[in-house]
Amino acid sequence: MNFYSPPTLMELARQCLLRDEYLAISALKDLPNMMFPVMFKEAFIDGHTKILTAMIPVWPFPYLSVGTMLKNLNLDTLKAVLEEIDILISKPVFSSRCKLREITLSHDLVVVWAGSHEVEGLPEFMEQEKPVENSPGYGTKNKLKVTTELQFMEGHLDECSTYLLQWAYQREDSIHLHCRKLKIYGLTKAAVIEMFKIVHAEYIEDLELSCLCLEYLDFLNPYLKQMSNLLSLTLDEIIYTLNIDDYRNLNEEKVITVISHLPTFHHLQELYVHGVIFIECLRCLKKPLEVLSFTDCDLSQSDLDYLPYCLNIFELRSLHLTDVRLSNLLLEPLGFLLERVRHTLKSLQLMSCEMGETHFNALLPALSQCYQLTVVNFYGNELSLLFLKKLLHHTAKLSQLADELYPAPQECYDNRDVVLSHRLENFCSELLDILRAIREPKKVTFGTIKCSKCGGSYVYDLETQCCFFEKNPPWA
């Protein structure tokens, strides 16, 4: 039975104000602080532009995040927000109520704004931390900080990003543009040079480089050296060269030379590598990584042998290998690596790595010692029912596991690789019993190989305890 919960007095007051634009704007000077965040969000969603922009000059908290509401950002909305910022910074003296120091325009960067949960936590956001000398932002305390993210697609910014950069450049005496996340998918050198005249590289914390050739990576190197506070780096499909003739003459030594010239990132915590010769990238790191992710990389035996001795990965929290062919390699070094990170590792993903029972046998002794693991993903590898039982006897001892993904047993397929769903249901029920005998599993899923036509998979999970077809499984 559903019970109707009447709106609170605060909700009624907010609804009343939003229905009367003039009343809402005139009431802002006396509006309780706790009403600002929710009222701002509702005004934004309902398109009350005048109310929205009138709130910015009297915003009573240090932070204002509009990025989470700008999923479909258009130029008109951006201009409306920036026009009110212009009004704010043009005033010789800010409103006594205005505490605004930072506006966040990033889509996926969540900045908590005080008052978002009624009055809880207000004091901690009402105080400004004193800037530390030589730290990012020092010397800019009198400027309004505008935080954003930028994305280059084939050498071009979208119209909103272009407008924002031009706007910030014209107001550099009063606005500090802070780009925390930068994505570059292909580039033109001229555009990058112009961008870095406005964007301060030392404030970039998250960098994604995709579909670039090595010569462009070499061109970016001076800017990379300025990224002294980089926390996350993604290298995706860094190709050797755009010139076919150069490609014929290119050897591995030249590739290694370029990559080895990458700067030392002293604060890097996360490295994501897709389709790149990655071992040389690890030599560019100073601070121990927390996340190491390889996707679609060619891994040699010498690469694998080197990993356990890499000093930068002994504090790993996440180790993810996806579509990395391991079938022709000896995995004892990977087992040695797991043993060395057993006290810190929380997430282990070995997905679609062409691993068989021999490969997993090399890892089981070390895997059994990784007691901090909360997530394991072994989907996409070929394992028999008998071996899956052996594997689950080991993972059953890992009491912290909260999310487990395993491949369906090979006995669930006929000789044409057609899934026999009744077998999947029977076998997976047996496998779950192994876990239940030792601990109470939280989330366990078994999945078949994805269909070559639709990309779907048959799934058996702990929640439903039945076999069903999922057209777009999140892991496939």
Swiss-Prot record:
SUPFAM superfamilies: RNI-like. Keywords: Leucine-rich repeat, Repeat. Expressed in ovary, specifically in oocytes. Detected in follicles with two layers of granulosa cells, and are present in early as well as large antral follicles. LRR repeats lie at residues 97-121, 176-200, 201-226, 227-264, 265-285, 286-317, 342-369, 370-394. InterPro entries: LRR_dom_sf (IPR032675), PRAME (IPR026271), PRAME_domain (IPR050694). The keyword tRNA processing does not apply. GO terms for biological process: negative regulation of apoptotic process; negative regulation of cell differentiation; negative regulation of DNA-templated transcription; positive regulation of cell population proliferation. Belongs to the PRAME family. This is Oogenesin-2. The lineage of its organism: Eukaryota, Metazoa, Chordata, Craniata, Vertebrata. The gene is Oog2.
